[in-house]
Design a protein with these regions (language model features):
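A short, Lys/Arg-rich alpha-helix, primarily the initiator
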Residues: 1-29, 72
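Helix-turn-helix DNA-binding elements, focusing on the entry/boundary residues of the two helices
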Residues: 31, 42, 57-60
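Short alpha-helical "recognition helix" segments of helix-turn-helix
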Residues: 30-35, 63
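Recognition helix of helix-turn-helix/homeodomain-like DNA-binding domains
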Residues: 38-54
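Residues in the helix-turn-helix
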Residues: 33, 44, 73
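Short C-terminal boundary/hinge segments that cap the last helix of small helical domains
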Residues: 68-87
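Short, basic-rich loop-to-helix N-cap that marks the start of a DNA-contacting helix
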Residues: 52-65
Length: 88
């Protein structure tokens, strides 16, 4: 497996959360449904999605699945974008 040292993990996490937030908003996914699926408080979920920095994996997966997105697609796209930025 290839090492991607040039990728900024903090920026990658922020990009993934931002893409997830956008999808949650576009699909009108409720914080309650994400909370029910993840076990986190809906206010905490909302706060972390709005910060666009990082969030626990369990919460992120619940947000992705509840909004009907593909977690692999979100991660893959974000990694490709971060790789392109690192190479520029």
């Amino acid at each position: 497996m290839e090492t991607r040292e040039e990728i900024d993990c903090e920026a990658l996490a922020a990009d993934v959360v931002n893409k997830t937030r956008t999808n949650v908003l576009l699909t009108k996914t409720t914080m309650t449904s994400i909370a029910d699926r993840s076990g986190f408080n809906r206010l905490t979920i909302s706060k972390l999605l709005d910060k666009k920095k990082d969030m626990p994996l369990r919460m992120w997966l619940a947000a992705v699945y509840e909004s009907g997105a593909d977690p692999c697609e979100i991660l893959s796209k974000a990694i490709k974008e971060q790789s392109a930025l690192a190479e520029a």
